[in-house]
Every structure is written in C-alpha cells, then in structure tokens.
C-alpha cells in the first residue's frame, strides 16, 4: 500500500484536461483545453479541483454548493470568501486536504460514499448534494480503528467542510482513527437525518470500511455541533436510523450556543473562543456544567482572543485542542 503523504511531500498533479472554462446551469463546471497540469498550491483554481477526473464528479461537494459557492476565478487561497462566519482559515490546511484526497484517488483508494441510493436521489433531488468522505486511519491499528463522524457548520445555510470537518478528519486519520465527514442538506432536521443515515451506513458497511463500531463519536462545529448534540442525545434512531443503532460514546462540540439537554446525552467535550459573537462561551459553559451535574463526563475549554469558527485553531492558543478532544473520547470508549 502506498504511504499517505502531507501536502509538503505530495506529488499530486491536477488533471491534464486543464482549467475551467465555465459553469453549467446545474453548477457543474466544464474544462478548457490547453493549460498545463501542476501541483496543488494556493494558486490552484478551485474549479480545477472540483472538475478533477480523479474525483469522479463529486468534487463539487468539497466546497459550498448553496450559500456563497466558489466562482470560476477563485483559487484555493480565496476560500475564505466562501466561508462566512469562519475565522483562522489557513490556505496551507486547504492545500493539505486537497493534496491528500487526490493522492488517495491516484492510489485507487475509495474515500467517497453515497449514503442514499440512486432511487432515493431520483425521488428527492435534494439528496444529490449529500455524501460521506472517509479519511482512513493510518498506522498499525488502522484496520480495526474506531470511527468519528464530523459535521461541519455553516448556519444550516451551507456546509463548510473544507475548513470545519475535512481538516479534523485528516488529523484524526493521522492520529490512528477513522474520520468521516458528512455532507448534509442545510436544514436542521434534514441535516440530522443525513447524519443519522451516515452513522447507519457506517454500521452496515463496517466490514467493508474496516472500522470498529464500538464507542464511536460525533463531532461538529457551530451548526454541526448542534447536529452532534441532537443525534448524540436523542440517538440516531430518532432521525431515521434503524432502531437499535447505538448512541455515540462521546460528542465533541465547537462553538455552539446550544443549551438543550435530552436526559440521555453522551459524554461531551466542548470548546469556544471568548470573543465569539455567535456562540457565547458563557452559554456553553453553563450547558456543560448542567450536564456535568447529572453525572455525565464533560470537558470545557474557552480560548482567549478567538472568535467564531476557528477550526483546528492552527497558530492560535487553541492549537492542539483536537488532541485533547481525541483523548477525552478515547477515555469514554
């Protein structure tokens, strides 16, 4: 098996078919002829990524498809224009994610899965922009590693996966666990149904995916954190998964002002910045304290100077929070 590589080492080449000429009415981009391929960099056009043949037509799901989708003149360095409400967006992280995904496909490894059938998508066209991206666990325990499902935020107006779930999943994979990023319909109820469907899909295909289903976790930022809390607390079956689908061992939540408790909430880790104008750290702290008072294991962190949507918190006081969260989850399994 080919080793996986970081963006600094990856020799991933964009398709020789060239750069984007235009966009069709359904949002699918086309190719222009004559441009040379090159390595993934900050200057790589986003549409070159979307239309890369290695991505088999689902490249569009790497980026927002609803609110502020990318335009044909944007490069990876322009991604922040597509991600309202987010901060600490690092182009190097984006390049790392794209390089990883293309290198996986170049090595003929599958990482995208439809969670709905063709018949279901034909009956409900909104399901076309859903799916599950897998970042496979690396290291000796990869063949039997546990899994986490990460839901990006976006205010239930779009899915900010390239900043708020893909980097998390890649970090988890490099830490020896399976990370799955769900691309969902931007509506609170439908998003939870898509997350529950993703969880049941993983359980149903556990052997094919080589994952350990015991003690899994749900992660999310902002709106995605609400999804993790709702599906984690009420259980996947409450949102359409088969009856008996287990609840997660832990919910990992970033920057959400949610304060709803279900009475069956899993162990919960939460973090937020003290300058978040969307999710009050005091509200989050009060929620975690109330949950802890019921005997549920909790851990809470507030980071000085950070605003909403800091993702991995690269080069900030929050950097490394994901390793703390991973340790918290493992302690609950």
Where are these regions (language model features)?
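C-terminal catalytic histidine-bearing segment of alpha/beta-hydrolase fold enzymes
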Residues: 296-333
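Short amphipathic alpha-helix adjacent to the substrate-entry channel of hydrolases
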Residues: 162-179
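Short beta-strand/loop motif that positions the catalytic acidic residue
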Residues: 270-272
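N-terminal targeting or regulatory segments adjacent to alpha/beta-hydrolase or S9 domains
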Residues: 14, 23-131
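Acidic catalytic loop of the alpha/beta-hydrolase fold
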Residues: 275-279
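Short beta-strand element of the alpha/beta-hydrolase
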Residues: 145-153
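N-terminal secretory signal peptides and thylakoid transit peptides that target proteins
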Residues: 1-15
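Primarily recognizes the serine-hydrolase "nucleophile elbow" in alpha/beta-hydrolase
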Residues: 197-264
């Amino acid at each position: 098996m080919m080793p996986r590589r970081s963006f600094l080492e990856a020799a991933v080449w964009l398709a020789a078919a060239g750069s984007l000429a235009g966009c069709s009415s359904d949002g699918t981009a086309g190719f222009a002829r004559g441009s040379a391929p090159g390595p993934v960099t900050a200057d790589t056009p986003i549409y070159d990524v979307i239309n890369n043949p290695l991505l088999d037509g689902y490249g569009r799901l790497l980026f927002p498809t609803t609110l502020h989708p990318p335009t044909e003149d944007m490069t990876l360095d322009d991604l922040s224009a597509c991600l309202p409400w987010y901060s600490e967006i690092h182009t190097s992280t984006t390049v790392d994610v794209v390089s990883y995904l293309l290198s996986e496909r170049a090595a003929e490894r599958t990482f995208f899965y439809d969670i709905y059938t063709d018949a279901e998508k034909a009956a409900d066209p909104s399901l076309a922009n859903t799916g599950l991206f897998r970042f496979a666990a690396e290291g000796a325990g990869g063949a039997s590693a546990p899994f986490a499902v990460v839901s990006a935020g976006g205010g239930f107006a779009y899915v900010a996966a390239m900043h708020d779930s893909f980097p998390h999943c890649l970090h988890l994979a490099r830490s020896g666990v399976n990370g799955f990023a769900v691309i969902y319909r931007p509506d609170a109820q439908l998003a939870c149904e898509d997350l529950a469907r993703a969880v049941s899909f993983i359980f149903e295909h556990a052997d094919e995916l080589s994952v350990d289903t015991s003690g899994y976790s749900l992660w999310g930022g902002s709106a995605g954190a609400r999804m993790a809390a709702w599906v984690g607390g009420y259980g996947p079956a409450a949102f359409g998964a088969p009856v008996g689908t287990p609840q997660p061992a832990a919910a990992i939540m970033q920057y959400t002002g949610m304060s709803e408790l279900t009475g069956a909430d899993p162990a919960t880790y939460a973090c937020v910045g003290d300058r978040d104008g969307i999710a009050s750290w005091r509200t989050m702290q009060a929620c975690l304290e109330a949950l802890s008072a019921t005997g549920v294991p909790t851990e809470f962190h507030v980071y000085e100077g950070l605003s909403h949507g800091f993702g991995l918190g690269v080069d900030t006081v929050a950097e490394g929070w994901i390793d703390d969260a991973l340790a918290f989850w493992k302690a609950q399994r």
